[in-house]
Amino acid sequence: MMLTAQDLQAEQAYHIGKRQMHNRCLHGCRVACGLGVTLRRKYVYIDPGMALDCHGNEIVVPETVKMSLPQRKRRFFLTLSYVEVETGRVPSPFTEGDHHREEFSRIQEAYTLGWSARDPLSAHDWHLGAWAACGQSHPLSLAKFTIQRGQIKLSRSFQERVNASRDTLGSG
C-alpha cells in the first residue's frame, strides 16, 4: 500500500481537529499569554503573545504591533482573528495546455487585528477565566475603548477580564 498526499492531508486534518477540540473544551476562548494593550496618543501597541479563538485555533502574535486608532464614535473594540494564508507557489501538475498555471503548496498560520463597533464575545458565557468556546472561528476581543469628553480611554475593567483569562490558564 502506497501512502498518498490524500492520506497525509487526512492525518493532518485529524490531528489539527483533535488539538482544536482540546483547546475549545479545556481552555475556551481566551488570551493564553502576553497580548497586553497600551494606548499612546493616536496609537495602540499590542504586545507579543498567544490566544485561543472559539474554534480552538492558536493565534500567535510574534512581535509588538503598532496600530493607528480608528475614527469611531462612543466605543469600539480591538479584535484579533486567526487566518490561514496560502504560500509556496508551485507549477500545477494538473493543467492541460496551460503550462504557466500555479497553485499554492503550503498554508501559513497568521493573524489579523481589527476594529469592531461591538464586542464579538458579548454573547458568550464567562466562566472560570475564559469565554465559553462556541466552536465558530470569529474574532477575539483584546481591548475596549470609549470616548469620554473627546478623549479616547482604554477600559480598565475590560482589560482586567482579558488579563484574568490569561492569568488563569494552566493554573488549574
What are these regions (language model features)?
Residues M1-Y45:
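N-terminal "first-domain core" detector
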Residues Y43-I46, M50-G172:
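Beta-strand-rich solenoidal segments
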